[in-house]
C-alpha cells in the first residue's frame, strides 16, 4: 500500500506516478485504449466500524454502495473517490474534475470494500466550461458516464443514487465518505458541520487525505458537495473544501443525461499547498 501524504490533493501527474510505482500488475488495456483499468477489483481486508461517526476525524465504516473508488490507468491503485448520481439514464457518477485527465483510462467501483467489486468504465466526462478554460476551482466537479459491470445496472448495484443538490448552508450537517489512496483499504467517513471560507463550502474533519478527492458531501440522500475546489480540496487534512454546487452543476447534469460527446479533461494546475 502506498504511503498516504498529509494533504488531500496530489497533482494528477504525481498521483499517476505514485500509483504506477505502488500498484501490482493488473488486467486492463493501456491508457487511451477506451477500456479502463481492471475489470474486477480484488477484495480488501478492511475492518468496518459500527460506532457512531465522530465529528473529529474519519473512521472505518461499512462501504456505502452509492460511494466508490476511482482507479486511473492500468493499475489496481485507487487515487480518488466518487459517487453514483440519481439520473434519468442510470449511468452517471460524480467526482472531482481534477481526478480525471483526457487519454488516461479510468474505472469506478461502487461500494468498494472487502469483496472488491465490478469496475464500471468511464465512457464520457462532462465538465463545467470554467474548468476546461482555466481549471477554475469553483468548477472542480465532473459528471461521468460509465458502462460495464455485471449486474442489472449501476443504480441497482448502488441501491439507488444520490440526488444532486445545492451547496450546504453554513451550520448544516454533512457526512463525507471516501477512500484513502492506495491498494485495497476500506471506506472511511466523517460527519461534520459545513461552514464557508474564501467563497467555498468548508468542513473541519480530520483524516481526509489523498484519495478523498471527489468524495461526496451527503445530507440524507442528497449530495451537496464533494472534496475538491480550493487547492483541490485543501492543503490540510483537517479541513476540506468543496466547489460550489449551484445551477451550473444542475445544468451539467441535464447535459450529461442528454448524452452526446463528453469533454477532454485538462490536467489540473498545481495547487498552492
Predicted feature residues:
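Conserved catalytic-core segment of clan PA serine endopeptidases
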Residues: 52-65, 73-74, 106-152
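Catalytic nucleophile loop of clan PA
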Residues: 207-228, 233-234
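Protease-domain processing segments flanking chymotrypsin-fold serine proteases, especially trypsin-like
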Residues: 2-87, 245, 251-273
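Catalytic histidine site
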Residues: 59-113, 193-197, 228-229
Amino acid at each position: 500500500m502506498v504511503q498516504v501524504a498529509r494533504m488531500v490533493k496530489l497533482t494528477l501527474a504525481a498521483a499517476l506516478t505514485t500509483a504506477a510505482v505502488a500498484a501490482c500488475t493488473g488486467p486492463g488495456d493501456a491508457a487511451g485504449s477506451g477500456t479502463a483499468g481492471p475489470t474486477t477489483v480484488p477484495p480488501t481486508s478492511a475492518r468496518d466500524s459500527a460506532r457512531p461517526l465522530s465529528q473529529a476525524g474519519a473512521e472505518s465504516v461499512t462501504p456505502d454502495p452509492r460511494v466508490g473508488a476511482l482507479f486511473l490507468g492500468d493499475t489496481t491503485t485507487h487515487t480518488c473517490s466518487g459517487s453514483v448520481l440519481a439520473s434519468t439514464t442510470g449511468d452517471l457518477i460524480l467526482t472531482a474534475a481534477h481526478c480525471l485527465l483526457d487519454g488516461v483510462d479510468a474505472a469506478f467501483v461502487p461500494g468498494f470494500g472487502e469483496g472488491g467489486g465490478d469496475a464500471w468504465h468511464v465512457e464520457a466526462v462532462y465538465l463545467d466550461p470554467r474548468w476546461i478554460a482555466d481549471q477554475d476551482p469553483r468548477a472542480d466537479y465532473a459528471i461521468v458516464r460509465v458502462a460495464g459491470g455485471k449486474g442489472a445496472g449501476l443504480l441497482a448495484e448502488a441501491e439507488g443514487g444520490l440526488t444532486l443538490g445545492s451547496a450546504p448552508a453554513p451550520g448544516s450537517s454533512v457526512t463525507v465518505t471516501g477512500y484513502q489512496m492506495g491498494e485495497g483499504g476500506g471506506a472511511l467517513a466523517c460527519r461534520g458541520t459545513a461552514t464557508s471560507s474564501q467563497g467555498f463550502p468548508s468542513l473541519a474533519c480530520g483524516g481526509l487525505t489523498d484519495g478523498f478527492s471527489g468524495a461526496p458531501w451527503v445530507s440524507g440522500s442528497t449530495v451537496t458537495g464533494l472534496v475538491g475546489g480550493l487547492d483541490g480540496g485543501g492543503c490540510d487534512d483537517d479541513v476540506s473544501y468543496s466547489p460550489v454546487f449551484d445551477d451550473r452543476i444542475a445544468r451539467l447534469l441535464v447535459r450529461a443525461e442528454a448524452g452526446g460527446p463528453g469533454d477532454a479533461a485538462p490536467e489540473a494546475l498545481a495547487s498552492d499547498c
